[in-house]
């Protein structure tokens, strides 16, 4: 159940993507940006992030940033309350759909990972069967094995884990051909949000992500706008997955290093992510020139 946010009031809500937008070249929030955003929040500004990341990596990134508005995480599947350290809301998969998706991935020779939420909303578990998993795919697992808010669970029955739920995400890994076959089979089902990607960190591995219905950053922002009572929405982005939230914003802002298509869709283009550009823009827009 979604609760009204403690910071709820009218005004403008500022939402920034993380990677390539708020985060600098070292993939961190700079001390200057963290200090500025924290002080703006203390002065009443509504500021938060929207990202494909899970809370397990969002939480340490925002550790020095005192923001009170929940962050849109997992591409819109959840709102993460940074102050309370738990989910404010989640968009779950139907258990029967989660079961069918997991069965399909196994038939296609993929290795599914079932992301489930704990009942108290404090963290996620990701459940997987390592049997026969190639080394590059298993490295994806081990890279995430020591995160406080995303805990691994080995299982011999991923289908049963998905059916039992509550399931937030089915992530499956395998060859490009097998993943594309799964995408073709699943895309077009209104009960599912399906995407495909590769990651140069894991060469030769393709990834399938399947969430419940209408999971994207735009839907997450609509929910967040209702939650905060904000009258206007300004978003910041750099990549293709930011376009959906830019389309529902009152004002779309791209950083200088954004993809050309993102800059073309933006109302305003600011400096690069390496120059604290998001924090500086918000401070100027709200008239807090003493922070510049």
Model segments located where?
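Residue-level detector of anion-binding/catalytic polar loops
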Residues: 46, 111, 193, 251-252, ...
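A generic structural signal for well-ordered alpha-helical segments
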Residues: 40, 105, 186-187, 225, ...
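Short, structured coil segments at secondary-structure junctions
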Residues: 65-67, 75, 189-190, 248-249, ...
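N-terminal glycine-/serine-/threonine-rich phosphate-binding loop
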Residues: 2-17, 21-47
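Active-site phosphate-binding/coordination module
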Residues: 28-140
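Mg2+-dependent phosphoryl-transfer enzymes with acidic/Ser/Thr/Gly-rich catalytic loops
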Residues: 3-13, 29-30, 207-292
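Conserved acidic, metal-coordinating active-site core of Asp-based
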Residues: 118-236, 240
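A short acidic, helix-capping loop that chelates divalent metal ions and anchors anionic groups
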Residues: 22, 81, 203-207
